[in-house]
Amino acid sequence: MTFTRPTPRDDLIYLTEGGFEPELLYLHGIDLPCFAAFAILSNPAKRAIFRGIYERVCDVAAAEGTGLLLGWIGYRASPDWGGKLGLSPDGLKEATLAGIEFLEELRRAY
């Protein structure tokens, strides 16, 4: 996996997401143990819902011609929180890589 860090442009307005967890919880009824949204990526149905949420933001940025900065939902993907979720260090690594691939898929699509 190659990582490139784009340089923000001074002449471009950027849209950012403001956190999707409340929508997952309250509109879709998805339980987020320890408020760890990254854990839902292993469930295909929940992943599809999550992708739809992200795609809406991507669609707005594309339609408005703005840049887009997406954060990853893995701020809880640490050994402490992973342990509370029953993840081994290898399981946590897999979840982290799955989250990165999730954002890479979106980047390629847009």
Give each language-model segment a name.
Residues 1-110:
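Domain-level signal for soluble alpha/beta catalytic cores
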